[in-house]
């Protein structure tokens, strides 16, 4: 039995998120403006068949595939939304399920820290080498989701809504983690947009 944990369609990858994803991509790199689909399933090995189905169904490119024992995730992208949606539908048909049967998103952590200190900023920057750096004095938005893949959707919608800097968007493992920084007003707006986006997702209860 394959469980659909995450199924998230991104209509247009924002510049920072696309670049961040490209730093970790082992496949074909996404570019800003691409449509993208992030799928996470359990058990992890099931993702191989789903990648095969998607790539044979349309012109999508496979940006990333991560296979763990418990969970497997895949990211496909293409400039044309219809190609991405067609590949996604073929996967759903194979699983004999619907998009809305994905697992419910639970926000495990959601907080804004204002006026980050120099010591704190340095430690965060040393720990993270894929995104941008946080500067002392900036405000920081941190979020954690379960399943992990939903954090990508939150990051994309937050970047659409405000002039913020993406520090981290980790969507692998049991929990997804997002870190963004910027001016206090911008961070407040980004946090609002991220939370509202996740609330709009229709999932099984």
UniProtKB/Swiss-Prot annotation:
Record comment regarding domains? Contains 2 BMC domains, trimerizes in a staggered manner to give a hexamer; each subunit in one trimer interacts with 2 subunits in the facing trimer. Each stacked hexamer can form a pore of about 14 Angstroms in diameter. Dimerization of the trimers forms a channel-like compartment, accessible via an open pore. This channel may be large enough to accomodate transport of substrates into and out of the carboxysome.
Query: Which GO biological process categories is it annotated with?
Result: carbon fixation
Query: Which GO CC terms are listed, alphabetically?
Result: carboxysome
The record describes the protein's role as:
Part of the carboxysome shell, a polyhedral inclusion where RuBisCO (ribulose bisphosphate carboxylase, cbbL-cbbS) is sequestered. It may control transport of RuBisCO reactants in and out of the carboxysome.
The organism's taxonomy opens as: Bacteria, Pseudomonadati, Pseudomonadota, Gammaproteobacteria, Thiotrichales
Self-association state and partner proteins as the record states: Homotrimer. Forms a dimer of stacked trimers, the same faces interact. Probably forms a CsoS1-CsoS1D-CsoS2 complex.
* Similarity comment text for this entry: Belongs to the EutL/PduB family.
Q: Where in the cell is it found?
A: Carboxysome
Please verify whether the record's keywords include Repeat.
yes
Domain BMC circularly permuted span(s) in chain numbering:
3-100, 106-205
List UniProt keywords, sorted A-Z. Bacterial microcompartment, Carbon dioxide fixation, Carboxysome, Repeat
- Tell me the superkingdom of the source: Bacteria
Show where the record puts the motif Gates the pore: 68-69
Q: What is this protein called?
A: Carboxysome shell protein CsoS1D
Coding gene?
csoS1D
Q: Which Gene3D superfamilies match?
A: 3.30.70.1710
Any Pfam family the entry gives: BMC
